[in-house]
């Protein structure tokens, strides 16, 4: 894809499936030049098509991040929108039985990965006339639930990072938005339950959950507001979900 310096550039992490894929496509259709990053390069290439660049990215690996950002710099010279979407949940064990590996895995991606990518992209965000950082949080960043301590703690951290970024970037033309979805049917639960599709399907039993396009629509809304308007956060959940742990299910 030949770079067009007049069109805005949107970087989306975790773009091989789910919310990341839907967001890359939605922004591409709105005229953004897309740079989509993910570990599963073949899948992210299929997602992006002719909307932009598909590049390998592992947010737990600083060398991978540096190479990725270097490619963006060479192709476009700036980033107008950064969507920190890469994230995951692992397990539902109570704290008394918590797995170090699960907790480390979630924090490496959800928290440190977000920090590393944001840090590496900041010089290119500052090159844009108006930059925008969109962090994928969760309603789990506002609440807690049994068995979810590792994940909810990581999403509380995302909320803290987003709020701190607004303080640190105050006075600069860079907006910060946190998107906090509730129940969204994607590969999320399949990953959480280590590929157990029945357990993943049971999460959505008797409920019409959100889908990835619902979240992508919120992201498009936030980034297309006038430059002086900063949507701090959007909390979105299916009507059947009143809290992380309270869902009205139909038999």
Model-assigned labels for residue ranges:
Residues 123, 167-170:
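Alpha-helical segment proximal to the catalytic Tyr-Lys
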Residues 118, 154:
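Active-site helix of classical SDR
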Residues 138:
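Residue(s) in the substrate-gating loop at a strand-loop-helix junction
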Residues 178-182, 197-245:
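C-terminal helical subdomain
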Residues 93-95, 102-104:
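Substrate-binding pocket helix/loop in short-chain dehydrogenase/reductase
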Residues 57-67, 100:
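The beta1-alpha1 cofactor-binding region of Rossmann-like NAD(H)/NADP(H)-dependent oxidoreductases
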Residues 16-17:
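Conserved glycine-rich cofactor-binding loop
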């Amino acid at each position: 894809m030949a770079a067009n310096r007049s069109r805005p550039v949107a970087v989306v992490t975790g773009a091989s499936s789910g919310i990341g894929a839907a967001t890359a496509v939605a922004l591409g259709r709105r005229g953004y030049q897309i740079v989509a990053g993910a570990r599963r390069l073949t899948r992210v290439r299929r997602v992006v098509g002719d909307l932009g660049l598909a590049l390998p990215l592992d947010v737990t690996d600083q060398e991978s991040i540096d190479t990725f950002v270097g490619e963006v710099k060479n192709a476009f010279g700036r980033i107008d929108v950064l969507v920190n979407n890469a994230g995951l949940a692992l397990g539902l064990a109570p704290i008394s039985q918590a797995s170090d590996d699960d907790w480390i895995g979630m924090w490496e991606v959800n928290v440190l990965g977000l920090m590393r990518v944001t840090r590496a992209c900041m010089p290119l965000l500052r090159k844009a006339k108006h930059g925008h950082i969109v962090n994928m949080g969760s309603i789990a960043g506002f609440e807690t639930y049994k068995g979810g301590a590792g994940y909810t703690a990581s999403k509380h951290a995302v909320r803290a990072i987003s709020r701190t970024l607004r303080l640190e970037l105050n006075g600069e033309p860079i907006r910060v938005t946190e998107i906090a979805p509730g129940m969204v049917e994607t590969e999320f639960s399949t990953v959480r339950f280590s590929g157990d599709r029945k357990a993943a399907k049971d999460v959505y039993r008797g409920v019409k959950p959100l889908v990835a396009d619902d979240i992508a629509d919120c992201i498009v809304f936030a980034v297309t507001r006038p430059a002086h308007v900063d949507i701090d956060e959007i909390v979105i959940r299916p009507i059947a979900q009143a809290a992380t742990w309270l869902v009205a299910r139909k038999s």
